[in-house]
Swiss-Prot record:
PANTHER family: ANGIOGENIN, RIBONUCLEASE. Secreted ribonuclease that can either promote or restrict cell proliferation of target cells, depending on the context. Endocytosed in target cells via its receptor PLXNB2 and translocates to the cytoplasm or nucleus. Under stress conditions, localizes to the cytoplasm and promotes the assembly of stress granules (SGs): specifically cleaves a subset of tRNAs within anticodon loops to produce tRNA-derived stress-induced fragments (tiRNAs), resulting in translation repression and inhibition of cell proliferation. tiRNas also prevent formation of apoptosome, thereby promoting cell survival. It comes from Miopithecus talapoin (Angolan talapoin). The gene is ANG. Keywords: Angiogenesis, Cytoplasm, Developmental protein, Differentiation, Disulfide bond, DNA-binding, Endonuclease, Hydrolase, Nuclease, Nucleus, Protein synthesis inhibitor, Pyrrolidone carboxylic acid, Secreted, Signal, Stress response. Its EC number is 3.1.27.-. A motif (Nucleolar localization signal) lies at residues 55-59. Has weak tRNA ribonuclease activity by itself due to partial autoinhibition by its C-terminus, which folds into a short alpha-helix that partially occludes the substrate-binding site. In absence of stress, the ribonuclease activity is inhibited by RNH1 in the cytoplasm. In response to stress, dissociates from RNH1 in the cytoplasm and associates with cytoplasmic ribosomes with vacant A-sites: ribosomes directly activate the tRNA ribonuclease activity of ANG by refolding the C-terminal alpha-helix. In response to stress, the angiogenic activity of ANG is inhibited by RNH1 in the nucleus. This is Angiogenin. GO terms for cellular component: angiogenin-PRI complex; basement membrane; cytoplasm; cytoplasmic stress granule; endocytic vesicle; extracellular space; growth cone; neuronal cell body. It holds the Pfam family RnaseA.
Length: 146
């Protein structure tokens, strides 16, 4: 009995060792998603907001053409990946059931070289995300819904 329990624990611990990097990678991709697209309490939502946020998030060398920031709470965004606040959309994507407050920053001018200047578009939109292991890892698009 003790031998069987010891073997079980050994196999269990080896399994944890194999899955931990995968879980850590998923968490890393989720944190990257939040870094690029999440701002709980935006200050303003105008062109200056976009210039500042894009610079702060490291998207200005070279200048990124477009980026959308989602405003709200993380739990609601994560819920898109489940049935609580999301529905299947296309292949391997999920669309939010409820609209989110968002700010989309579009690069003004054509040069990808700094200084980068952005035009802000604020609104409420349903968002489409790719999920891995119940976490959003990619913002595919945002859709205005009447």
């Amino acid at each position: 009995m003790v031998m069987g329990l010891g073997l079980f624990l050994l196999v269990f611990m080896l399994g944890l060792g194999l899955t931990s990097p995968t879980l850590a990678q998923d968490n890393s991709r989720y944190r990257d998603f939040l870094s690029k697209h999440y701002d709980a309490r935006p200050q303003g939502r105008n062109d200056r907001y976009c210039d500042s946020m894009m610079r702060r998030q490291g998207m200005t060398s070279p200048c990124k053409d477009i980026n959308t920031f989602i405003h709200g709470n993380r739990r609601s965004i994560r819920a898109i990946c489940g049935d609580e606040n999301g529905n299947p959309y296309g292949e391997n994507l999920r669309i939010s059931r409820t609209p989110f407050q968002v700010t989309t920053c579009n690069l003004r001018g054509g040069s990808p070289r700094p200084p980068c200047r952005y035009r802000a578009t604020a609104g409420f939109r349903n968002i489409v995300v790719a999920c891995e292991n119940g976490l959003p890892v990619h913002l595919d698009q945002s859709i205005f819904r009447p």
